[in-house]
Structures are given as structure tokens and as C-alpha cells.
Amino acid sequence: MTALLKIGLVSVSDRASSGVYQDQGIPELQQWLEQALVDTFEVETRLIPDEQPLIEQTLKELVDEHHCHLVLTTGGTGPAKRDVTPDATLAVADREMPGFGEQMRQVSLHFVPTAILSRQVGVIRKNSLILNLPGQPKAIKETLEGVKDEQGKVLVKGIFSAVPYCLQLIDGIYIDTKPEVITSFRPKAARRENLEK
């Protein structure tokens, strides 16, 4: 349970991958993870176009070869024909985790009505959790942290509060978050102080 956390970050964008503009998804994810996680982690990053076979290959590589515990994708989750990230994610999945997609849409609907058009999914492949996040940096943070009022009180929980316990259940790795950013939830019996008894 003291293994180094490995995270794969995949930005899916035709234009960013071809140099039309600079990718903002991976830097936003890295910055947020550095602020939110207590644990040291290692990152594998990929910037790729909206091509389903390439997305599938990338997800398999990050899980099967690099042994990433968590893979976060950004972009390609809408209804447009080139938005195939969820399709690729489902194609490589062993099991679907529908609660993640449902909660991401719930959070995003507090900010934009078009969130209902999102097809984001969460899946398990082997011992890894793969989550599709929005493409916009602001929406990435909102989805991970949730909806907060002006005083910082959480009104709607973000998806990352469930990620540490999910990783613990599927792989055995124990990670924690900084409560000032997001509070991770796990049952009392699964908390570090009770595991070490």
C-alpha cells in the first residue's frame, strides 16, 4: 500500500495535437493534482488527436505497460462526430463506473446547461480507473472539486472525493487529498489509521 501513485494524463484534441494552439488540459490537470494530492505521484502525459484507435491504444499503453493507477482524459466528450473519447474508453473497459459520469454532468449543470450533452464516462481496466473529463480548464477543476459557495463550502461534491477509495478498492494503493482543496471520502474501516491496527 505504499506504492508510488502513477497517473496518466491524456489530452485529446485535433487542434492542440497539430500545434494550432497550446494544450491547456494537461497543465490544468497537473496543477490541480499537485494542489490536491498529499501523496507523491509520477505522471505520464500524452497529447493526441481525436482518433478512436489511437485513444484506445494510448489508454491500453498507460494501463497495461506503464501501470498507471489512474488515467484522466480531457476533451472529446461531446456529441460531435469527432468526439470519440468515451467510445474509446468504453472499448477498453473491463467494467463501467456510471456514477462518475452522472456526477460530472450533475456538477457541470450548475454552470452550463449544455453539460447535458457530455458523454463522459468512468471505467475500470484491470486495476486502473479511467475517467473522461471536460476539455475546458475551468470545467476540469469544477468537475474534480464540485460546486462551492462563496465561503468555499461544498454544495455539490466533485468526483475526485471518491477517487482515492475507488483506487484502494481496485488496486490496494492508498492515497489521500488535501481537505482545503477536496476531502476524500472512505468508510472508517478503510482509513489509514484503522488499516494499520
Model-assigned labels for residue ranges:
Residues M1-K197:
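Non-catalytic beta/alpha edge segments that cap or flank active sites
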